[in-house]
Design a protein with these regions (language model features):
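GIY-YIG nuclease catalytic motif and its immediate N-terminal context
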Residues: 1-52, 56-66, 70-79
Length: 79
């Protein structure tokens, strides 16, 4: 299984990523072992995730979410 996830960062920004284990990946982000963005912005909370059976579908969804504006991401999270 693959997951698309959104993290909230200390400065209020949002980070979208893909993984097979959301909790492990969040810990990596918090420990400074994630992407450069979360090392700089400090991930503080998992605020959303979606599950997919394969990497291809998850990657497509990740790309869709990354194109959304901030308000659209928050609307997605609320549903």
């Amino acid at each position: 299984m693959y997951f698309v996830y959104i993290l909230k960062c200390k400065d209020g920004s949002l980070y979208t990523g893909i993984t097979t284990n959301v909790e492990r990946r969040f810990k990596e982000h918090k420990d400074g072992k994630g992407g450069a963005y979360t090392r700089a912005k400090k991930a503080i909370k998992i605020i959303y995730s979606e599950q997919y059976k394969n990497r291809s579908k998850a990657s497509k969804r990740e790309a869709e979410i990354k194109k959304l504006r901030r308000a659209e991401k928050y609307a997605l999270i609320k549903h």
